[in-house]
Curated annotation (Swiss-Prot):
GO terms for biological process: galacturonate catabolic process. InterPro entries: 6-blade_b-propeller_TolB-like, DUF3748, PD40. This is Uncharacterized protein YidR. It holds the Pfam family PD40.
């Protein structure tokens, strides 16, 4: 069993220095040329008060403002298109007031390209609702590997108004079959550039021991036509157990626009429903384990390798240690990849070769080999503990970025 035994001395390089916070999203934080890191300036991940989306050149330290919010709105959680300098991020409401301000169900995705901003997802909260349009808040927007679609997590204004307990988190996708135009019968409604639907299905009261879930979250692309995500099941005893699910997506525009048994845009008493034939499938069955379920701490997003053959996630081993595990998108038994003596402390990402995964271990930046599980430390002697939120490889694989003490840092990977 491989343990972390290797260490090669590499220089850690601090990239930002301004006396403010710099926040990386958990993936896709580099421009396609591997020259710039994109970030937001929220004081912490728990507050949504940043006014700018910015980028820093890793070689020169030059900082550029990509977008500045106005009218009292705030922005954050930016990711980058894999092939062009196109940025997608969360935008809070303009002119917020007591009745309508930033919340899980009051936020949208926007895309900035060439300095121009456009709404990704439209919103229509006046019945009858509009197909291709959602009713609330989208969050953590990530382009598919080919850049054609955007995944996100979602909360619903209509259900929140009915009963907050019915506003269950779900996973959605923005597909390039817009624009979608809203008649704007409410001052807070807006149109969007993409056709948006939910692709997960939740219920407020899952049957204990079943595959039903009351929350779908922390999704990751599996190739360009499937998404894996964490779904909260109930054990036979009624305890929450987060399990891994996968959903295959429609292949063409007609598939994205075809409703199933329930309306794509929902009703006054039900959430929006997935397109016809889009049905989530459970991949892990961990109720019997000593430490059931994927872990929620550290918060992590499930991530598939670039080849589309292995989905990685974090789960405790039989000793209670948080380790990396791999499973095929087709299912089967998960394979424990790492055998560390201490918990993996952060979200993780794949090296673009698919041969390594990067994360925080023992308050250092580390890589695990995707076949052997052997762990190599890339850094040591951190003045502050690296943040658990993001460890992200550059597209060329040469750099690994993280946050530490409110600043952005990189190190060479030699990979």
């Amino acid at each position: 069993m491989a343990g972390p035994v290797l260490y090669q001395d590499r220089a850690m390089k601090q990239i930002t220095f301004a006396p403010r916070n710099h926040l990386l999203t958990n993936t896709n934080t580099w421009t396609p040329d591997s020259q710039w890191l994109v970030f937001d300036v929220r004081p912490s991940g728990a507050s949504f008060t940043g006014e700018t989306i910015e980028r820093v050149n890793i070689h020169t330290g030059e900082v550029e403002v990509i977008y500045r919010a106005s009218q009292g709105a705030h922005v954050g959680v930016v990711t980058v298109h894999p092939k062009s300098e196109k940025y997608v991020f969360i935008h809070g409401p303009e002119n917020p007031d007591e009745t309508w301000h930033y919340d899980f169900h009051h936020r949208r995705g926007v895309i900035v390209e060439g300095g121009k901003m456009s709404n990704l997802d439209a919103m229509d909260i006046t019945a009858p609702y509009t197909p291709g349009v959602l009713r609330g808040g989208s969050h953590v927007h990530v382009f598919s590997p080919n850049g054609e679609r955007v995944s996100f997590t979602y909360n619903d204004h209509v259900m929140h108004e009915l009963d907050p307990a019915l506003d269950l988190r779900n996973v959605g996708v923005a597909a390039p079959f817009g624009p979608v135009n809203v008649q704007k019968q409410h001052p807070r409604e807006y149109s969007g550039s993409h056709w948006c639907v939910l692709v997960s299905k939740t219920t407020p009261t899952p049957q204990p021991g079943s595959d039903e879930i009351n929350r779908a979250y922390e999704e990751g692309w599996v190739g360009n036509h499937a998404l894996a995500f964490i779904g909260d099941t109930l054990s036979p005893k009624g305890e929450k157990v987060p399990e891994l699910f996968i959903v295959e997506l429609p292949q063409d525009e007609a598939g994205w626009k075809a409703a199933g048994d329930a309306p794509l845009s929902g009703t006054e008493t039900t959430l929006p429903a997935p397109p016809r034939g889009v049905v989530q499938r459970r991949l892990t069955f961990t109720h019997h384990r000593a430490y059931p379920g994927l872990v929620n701490v550290p918060r992590h997003w499930v991530r598939c390798n670039p080849q589309g053959t292995q989905i990685a996630f974090l789960m405790r081993d039989d000793n209670g240690i948080v380790q990396l595990w791999l499973i095929s998108p087709q299912g089967g038994e998960p394979r424990q990849l790492t055998h560390n003596k201490t918990d993996i402390q952060s979200a993780f990402n794949w090296h673009p070769s698919g041969e390594w995964l990067g994360f925080v271990l023992d308050n250092r930046i580390a890589c695990a080999h995707a076949q052997s599980g052997e762990v190599e430390y890339l850094t040591e002697h951190h003045a502050n503990s690296p943040s658990a939120d993001a460890v992200v490889f550059s597209p060329d694989g040469q750099w690994l970025a993280w946050m530490e003490g409110g600043q952005l840092w990189i190190t060479e990977t030699d990979r």
